[in-house]
């Protein structure tokens, strides 16, 4: 379903009583079944926006349509005392044993982590943890997935690999996805729509018309979009 943010306000109070306004009267709409990337300089409220949509922080205004969401954090947040299988199973409390087994098998096969089902997080590499986090989010079977800097700690080869896993899972089960990133090429690879945040507002918005599967981010259209994005971010 579409997510509609209406007149969002969010402020933080520092220890010395100084108030920081992150959002004031902010509105946006995230289209049903689309992948939206949120770009912008550090400190403009990208992660705060996700936290508001995911109900992880208090806020003023209204957010319609988010419902229950799956969240992929920058630091993965796998449960250390549970195996890979257990971490994914944890998101399926109401499913039958057979349903859990089937769903977990499916997502682990997609990210090629079946052989790590009984491993604990401390036994996994950074890339493997990220793949488990994505698998867990899709296994939860929520309509909305939020991702905060999902690939920031990975090298280029791993980014490419995990981005491909992400695209494959979305082809099988379309979701409304919002992800925060500093990486313009990552946004161009994965997103249907890209927003640029500046000073608590959307300063630029553009659609990427080419299908995600097989998208050539070196092509003429994408290069034109890239140029506009850099201009918007560097304002």
Locate predicted features:
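Hydrophobic anchor residue at the start of the ABC signature
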Residues: 134
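ABC-type ATPase nucleotide-binding domains, specifically the catalytic core motifs of the NBD
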Residues: 13-16, 58, 86-101, 110
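Conserved ABC ATPase signature
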Residues: 120-124, 128
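The feature captures the beta-strand-to-loop junction immediately N-terminal to the Walker
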Residues: 39-41
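A short, proline-enriched helix->beta-strand linker immediately N-terminal to the Walker B motif
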Residues: 139-143
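Conserved structural motif at the start of ABC-family nucleotide-binding domains
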Residues: 3, 22-25
């Amino acid at each position: 379903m579409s997510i509609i943010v209406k007149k969002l306000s969010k402020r933080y109070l520092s220890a010395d009583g100084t108030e920081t306004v992150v959002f004031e009267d902010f509105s946006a709409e995230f289209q049903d079944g689309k992948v939206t990337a949120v770009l912008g300089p550090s400190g403009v409220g990208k992660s705060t926006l996700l936290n508001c949509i995911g109900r992880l922080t208090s806020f003023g205004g209204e957010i319609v349509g988010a419902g229950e969401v799956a969240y992929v954090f920058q630091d993965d947040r796998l449960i250390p005392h549970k195996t890979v299988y257990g971490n994914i199973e944890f998101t399926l409390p109401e499913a039958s044993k057979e349903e859990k087994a089937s769903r977990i098998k499916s997502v682990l096969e997609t990210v090629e982590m079946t052989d790590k089902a009984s491993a604990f997080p401390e036994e996994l590499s950074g890339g493997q943890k990220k793949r488990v986090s994505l698998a867990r989010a899709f296994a939860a079977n929520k309509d909305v997935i939020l991702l905060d800097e999902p690939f920031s700690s990975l090298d280029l080869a791993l980014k490419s690999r995990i981005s491909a896993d992400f695209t494959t899972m979305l082809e099988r089960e379309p979701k409304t996805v919002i992800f925060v990133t500093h990486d313009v090429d990552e946004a161009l690879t994965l997103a249907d729509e890209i927003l640029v945040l500046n000073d608590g507002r959307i300063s630029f918005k553009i659609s990427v018309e080419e299908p995600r599967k097989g998208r050539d981010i070196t092509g003429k259209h994408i290069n034109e979009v890239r140029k506009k994005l850099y201009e918007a971010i560097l304002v």
